[in-house]
Amino acid sequence: TVCNLRRCQLSCRSLGLLGKCIGVKCECVKH
């Protein structure tokens, strides 16, 4: 599967984090 950046950012934003694609993985990182 490919990382969907927009969906990744949305799900991370709800945690107060920044969404980033690392390879095929969605990573939530601090701003």
UniProtKB/Swiss-Prot annotation:
GO molecular function: ion channel inhibitor activity; potassium channel regulator activity; toxin activity
Disulfide feature: 3-21, 8-26, 12-28
Effect of residue 2 to F: 50-fold and 6-fold increase in potency of inhibition of KCa2.2/KCNN2 and KCa2.3/KCNN3, respectively
Keyword terms of this UniProt record: Calcium-activated potassium channel impairing toxin, Disulfide bond, Ion channel impairing toxin, Neurotoxin, Potassium channel impairing toxin, Secreted, Toxin
Site (Interacts with KCa2.2/KCNN2 and KCa2.3/KCNN3): 1-2, 7, 24
Main location: secreted
GO CC terms of this entry: extracellular region
One of the Pfam families matching this protein, by short name: Toxin_2
Domain description: Has the structural arrangement of an alpha-helix connected to a beta-sheet by disulfide bonds (CSalpha/beta).
Record-stated family: Belongs to the short scorpion toxin superfamily. Potassium channel inhibitor family. Alpha-KTx 05 subfamily.
Protein name, as recorded: Potassium channel toxin alpha-KTx 5.2
